[in-house]
Amino acid sequence: MKAISVLGSTGSIGTQTLQIAEEFPDQFKIVALTAGKNLDLVTKQIETHQPEVVSLADESLLPELTRRINSLNEDSKILKKPLLMAGAEGLNTAAAWGSADLVVTGIVGCAGLLPTLAAIEAGKDLALANKETLIAAGPVVIPALKKSGSRLLPADSEHSAIFQCLQGTPWADNARLSTGVPTPGFKSIQLTASGGAFRDWKAEDLVKATVEDATSHPNWSMGKKITVDSATLMNKGLEVIEAHYLFGLSYDQIEIIIHPQSIIHSMVELDDSSVLAQLGWPDMKLPILYCLSWPSRLKTPWPRLKLTQIGNLTFKEPDTNKYPCMELAYSAGKSGGTMPAVLNAANEKAVELFLEERFKFIDIPKVIEAICEKHKCDLNLNPSLSEILEIDNWAREEVLDYSEKNIKKMQF
C-alpha cells in the first residue's frame, strides 16, 4: 500500500486524488492533508481518510477544526485524532511527513514552491500538479531533485502523456528522474491544447470577454485560475517551460498544437519520423491515477475510449495574435534565469485581478508583457531560492502598480 500526502486537499487536484484513494482503498492510504479555508470539506476528508497530520493555511481556523475533530472522535467516527498544524510550518511538515511515500502537490501557484522543496529534501517522490514550482524555480528544483534522488512524476495531462510515451524507451529513466532526455533518436514533443473557452471566438471579440466567459472550459473541469490560463493559452505556455525542465529539451523542440477534442494529450516525435501519442478521455483522474500507481497500472471501471464514437480528431496551429501569452512564455523561457518567475508571478496576479473584474481579459497579456519588459535590465541567470522569492513578490507588486496607474482604461 502506498502512503500519500496531499497538498491542497480541497482543491481540484486534491479532491480528485482523494476520490481515487476511495476507489482503491487497498492500494492507497492518505497520511497527510493540507487545506485552505473549507472546513466543511476538510472535516469530511478527515473522517473518510483519517490522516496522521492535517494543516490549514489559516491558523485562526484551528480551534474550530479541533472542536469538529473532537466531536468525530467522541462519536467514534475517527480512530485517532490527527496532529493539527497551520501556515508554512504545517505545510512543509505535511510535505515531508515521515510515513509518506508520495506527495501530491495540488496547491495552485507559487505557494507550492517551498513545500515541494521540503518534500524533495526529505527524499519523497512527487506527483507534480503545481507547474508553477518548476516554472518559477526550475534552476533550484532540478538540482535539488538530482541531489536527493526524489522522482518527479508529472500529474498534469500533457506532461503525463509525454512521460507515458517515454516508458519502455531508452529515455524512460531520464524522464522520471528529470535528468533530461538524450538527443540521439529523439526529435521533439508536441503539447496539445484545447484552445480554451475562446477557441471559437474571433480575436477582435475578446474585448467583450467576461469572467464568466473565461471560466467556462469546453472540455475540462478545473479551478478558475487554470481555466483562465487555458483561455489565454498561458497555461500551455507555462507547460512549455515546465517541459523544458522536466525533459531537458530546448524550446525549439517543444511545439504547441490546438486539438479541440482533447483526446490526444501530447506526442513525442522521434528521429525516424515515428510519433508516439497518449490518448484518453479529458479527465484529470487519469494522469493523477498514473502518478499514484506508477510504475503499475490499475484496472478501473471508468469509461473506455472508443475512437469510432468520436469520429474526427482535428488539429491546427495556434493563432499568435489571438493568444499572445503563448509567445510571452516562450520568450521568458528562452531568457531563462528569473524571467520565468516574473512571467508566472505577473500572470498569477493579473488573473487574480481579472477575476475580481479589475480589468479586461485582453489586458492580461499587456500587463504581463510590461512587467517582463521592465525586468530585463535586472535579469538574474543563476538565482538562489531567496532571490526567486524576492522577484516573485516584486512582479506581483508591479502588476498592482501597473493596474492602479491604468485602471480607468482597463476596467470593464
UniProtKB/Swiss-Prot annotation:
Q: In which pathway does it act?
A: Isoprenoid biosynthesis; isopentenyl diphosphate biosynthesis via DXP pathway; isopentenyl diphosphate from 1-deoxy-D-xylulose 5-phosphate: step 1/6
Give the binding site residues for NADPH: 10-13, 36-38, 130, 132, 223
EC annotation from Swiss-Prot or TrEMBL: 1.1.1.267
List the Pfam families: DXP_redisom_C, DXP_reductoisom, DXPR_C
**Which key words are in the record?**
Isoprene biosynthesis, Manganese, Metal-binding, NADP, Oxidoreductase
- InterPro entries in the record: DXP_reductoisomerase, DXP_reductoisomerase_C, DXP_reductoisomerase_N, DXPR_C, DXPR_C_sf, NAD(P)-bd_dom_sf
Q: At which positions is Mn(2+) bound?
A: 156, 158, 239
Gene Ontology terms: biological process: isopentenyl diphosphate biosynthetic process, methylerythritol 4-phosphate pathway involved in terpenoid biosynthetic process
Q: Which GO terms describe its molecular function?
A: 1-deoxy-D-xylulose-5-phosphate reductoisomerase activity; manganese ion binding; NADPH binding
The EC class name is oxidoreductase
Q: Which Gene3D superfamilies match?
A: 1.10.1740.10, NAD(P)-binding Rossmann-like Domain
Q: Which reaction does it catalyse?
A: 2-C-methyl-D-erythritol 4-phosphate + NADP(+) = 1-deoxy-D-xylulose 5-phosphate + NADPH + H(+)
Q: Which cofactor does it need?
A: Mg(2+); Mn(2+)
Residues that hold 1-deoxy-D-xylulose 5-phosphate according to the record: 131, 157-158, 194, 217, 230, 235-236, 239
Q: What the protein does?
A: Catalyzes the NADPH-dependent rearrangement and reduction of 1-deoxy-D-xylulose-5-phosphate (DXP) to 2-C-methyl-D-erythritol 4-phosphate (MEP).
Record's NCBIfam families?
Dxr (TIGR00243), PRK12464.1 (NF009114)
PANTHER family the record matches: 1-DEOXY-D-XYLULOSE 5-PHOSPHATE REDUCTOISOMERASE, 1-DEOXY-D-XYLULOSE 5-PHOSPHATE REDUCTOISOMERASE, CHLOROPLASTIC
UniProt lists the family membership as follows: Belongs to the DXR family.
Name the UniProt record assigns to this protein: 1-deoxy-D-xylulose 5-phosphate reductoisomerase
Q: Which organism is it from?
A: Prochlorococcus marinus (strain NATL1A)
Highest classification ranks of the organism? Bacteria, Bacillati, Cyanobacteriota, Cyanophyceae, Synechococcales
